[in-house]
């Protein structure tokens, strides 16, 4: 199979083809997802919750992400690999460049950062140093204490307008992908249509350019909790590989996410 690149993901958007993505944290699952045809794999700071048992993503370190990025890269031949910049790992320019370099050296093809237009100068600096950037707007888990919990964002007209404005600013600054999390479906559609870069949704409705799920949610192995925007594909198919294949099929056909997995 041909190796997935950021330009290839852009071509998918331009052709109206949905992008499929999952989180991955080790070589074995990365290999499985890669072989099934998932377009992009994210080493997410969600590992703090699903692997380390934390209540949120804040304790995750850059070394944690680098370790798992190395593992995922070893299991991946064709999928595009993104790695999260964890909480407070990009507080200053010097810190940002050093930490991004660590993730790229570990095997990432792009780093993902949570935040709005305040990141624009940082994004420009990373691009100048050869580091591609993915943005992340909507519910940004590193800001959970600012939001007062894991809540849907952008329901108020003023919030939606601000988010759309920030998405445009991030694109202008140089991001090449955007993850949009937990926003009303109408806002997910508006952002995707307003940007030329691919928008990957998680709880952002079916009209984004692609979808991403946390693998533990897709397999139904997150302890006692299933987010509204997720679907347990393992219980439906009874086999991990079939679950991944069904997820890809549903995203590409537009069957997932359905209204029950979306916010209004």
Swiss-Prot record:
UniProt-listed InterPro entries: Pantoate_hydroxy_MeTrfase, Pyrv/PenolPyrv_kinase-like_dom, Pyrv_kinase-like_dom_sf
Cofactor(s) this protein cannot do without: Mg(2+)
Reaction(s) catalysed (UniProt annotation): 3-methyl-2-oxobutanoate + (6R)-5,10-methylene-5,6,7,8-tetrahydrofolate + H2O = 2-dehydropantoate + (6S)-5,6,7,8-tetrahydrofolate
Entry keywords, A to Z: Cytoplasm, Magnesium, Metal-binding, Pantothenate biosynthesis, Transferase
Any one of the GO CC terms: cytoplasm
Co-factor: note: Binds 1 Mg(2+) ion per subunit.
Binding sites annotated in the UniProt record for 3-methyl-2-oxobutanoate: 45-46, 84, 112
Residues of the active site: 181 (proton acceptor)
EC number: 2.1.2.11
Pathway entry: Cofactor biosynthesis; (R)-pantothenate biosynthesis; (R)-pantoate from 3-methyl-2-oxobutanoate: step 1/2
BP GO terms, sorted: pantothenate biosynthetic process
Superkingdom field: Bacteria
Keyword Nucleus annotated: no
Residues that span the membrane, as ranges: none
Enzyme class: transferase
Assembly information from the UniProt record: Homodecamer; pentamer of dimers.
Family membership noted in the UniProt record: Belongs to the PanB family.
Job description of the protein: Catalyzes the reversible reaction in which hydroxymethyl group from 5,10-methylenetetrahydrofolate is transferred onto alpha-ketoisovalerate to form ketopantoate.
PANTHER family: 3-METHYL-2-OXOBUTANOATE HYDROXYMETHYLTRANSFERASE
Name used for this protein in its record: 3-methyl-2-oxobutanoate hydroxymethyltransferase
Organism, scientific name: Alteromonas mediterranea (strain DSM 17117 / CIP 110805 / LMG 28347 / Deep ecotype)
Gene giving rise to this polypeptide: panB
